């Protein structure tokens, strides 16, 4: 019997049966255990979405066939999962790399400058300069251990008082590539996810290291600071990834409301940039930046008792309770 679930919408969600995560198929009205559906098929032995991505093109074709087979009533009742007994896990567990875009929406850049992120006029001018002839995308790494599910708690450590939110469109690679040109970048993408790049601003901008200042590890990689999912939506089911609405609410109040087409550097340009530095592999995650409306702009931060609702249009919505870390 299924007890847990990761995410894979339309052609998949990830569930854990008997405590082990396995692929699942979400058909809207019913969730199917792919472990049962696939046991005699081409995907035999595949135990996670992460493994599906290693050979994504044929696996995606097989998943479509499986979904059609099940949707027409050919799947037996033993494959149905009790939705009341599942827990959403991150769609992709143990990704090789998690890459995030910094300062990639004009409104977000301006609000961060206004909040005093730039300490000098020169820094201010540099932050506001987004002439692509002179400026490259800014990408940082986030620890995969920060991943959490779409309905898991966001845990605030006792070492920070400025935990902030950032709704983002995340994508997952389905092919390996190096020096991928932007015009071919989407050929390497398997699908998309909703994510929240939770950030500790007082760690991200270190006053105790004035010559270095920025600490991306300390600001971004705390446990639970990367809620992902609930679904992994294959690229074929996203008609235009540049026209997706991104919204985030804190305790019912809308804080962010943007559109993916407002990115400074497109997802394709970010893939091109990242792949000039490092080989991108199946299962790698790239999160593409956040629009304006973060808490730092107004000096407002998450606190225990808040509820964060994060959504990217067509990719599913998250709902995370904010709790304080219990320290023994």
Where are these regions (language model features)?
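Active-site microenvironments in enzyme catalytic cores
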Residues: 3-7, 15, 22, 44-250, ...
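Cationic, low-complexity basic patches in intrinsically disordered or flexible, solvent-exposed regions
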Residues: 10
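Conserved metal-binding segment of the jelly-roll/cupin
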Residues: 143, 149-150, 280-297, 310-313
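Short, solvent-exposed loop/turn positions at domain surfaces
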Residues: 157-159, 274, 296
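Residue-level recognition of short, solvent-exposed, well-ordered loop/turn junctions
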Residues: 93, 100, 281, 303-304
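Glycine-rich active-site loops that engage anionic ligands at enzyme catalytic sites
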Residues: 230, 254-281
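Charged, cofactor-coupling segments
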Residues: 3-7, 16-42, 226, 292-328
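Short, structured beta-strand/loop micro-motifs enriched in basic residues and often containing a Trp
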Residues: 150-153, 263-271, 288-293
């Amino acid at each position: 019997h299924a007890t847990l679930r990761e995410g894979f919408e339309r052609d998949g969600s990830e569930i854990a049966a008997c405590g082990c995560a396995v692929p699942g198929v979400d058909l809207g009205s019913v969730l199917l255990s792919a472990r049962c559906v696939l046991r005699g098929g081409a995907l035999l032995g595949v135990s996670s979405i992460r493994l599906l991505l290693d050979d994504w093109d044929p696996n995606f074709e097989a998943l479509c066939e499986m979904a059609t087979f099940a949707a027409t009533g050919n799947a037996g009742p033993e494959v149905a999962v009790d939705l009341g007994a599942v827990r959403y896990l991150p769609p992709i567990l143990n990704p090789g790399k998690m890459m995030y875009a910094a300062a990639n929406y004009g409104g977000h850049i301006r609000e961060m400058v206004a909040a005093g992120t730039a300490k000098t006029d020169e820094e201010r001018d540099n932050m506001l300069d987004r002439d692509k002839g002179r400026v490259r995308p800014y990408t940082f790494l986030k620890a995969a251990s920060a991943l959490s599910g779409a309905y898991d708690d966001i845990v605030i450590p006792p070492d920070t008082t400025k935990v902030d939110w950032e709704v983002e469109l995340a994508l997952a690679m389905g092919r390996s590539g190096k020096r991928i040109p932007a015009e071919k970048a989407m050929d390497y993408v398997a699908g998309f996810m909703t994510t929240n790049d939770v950030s500790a601003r007082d760690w991200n901008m270190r006053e105790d290291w004035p010559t270095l200042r920025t600490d991306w590890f300390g600001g971004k990689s705390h446990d639970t600071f990367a809620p992902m999912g609930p679904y992994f939506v294959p690229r074929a089911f996203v008609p235009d990834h540049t026209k997706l609405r991104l919204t985030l609410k804190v305790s019912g109040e809308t804080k962010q409301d943007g559109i993916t087409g407002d990115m400074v550097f497109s997802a394709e340009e970010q893939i091109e940039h990242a792949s000039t530095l490092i080989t991108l592999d199946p299962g790698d995650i790239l999160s593409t930046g956040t629009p304006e409306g973060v808490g730092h702009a107004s000096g407002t931060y998450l606190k225990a008792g808040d509820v964060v609702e994060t959504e990217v249009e067509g990719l599913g919505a998250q709902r995370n309770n904010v709790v304080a870390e219990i320290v023994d």
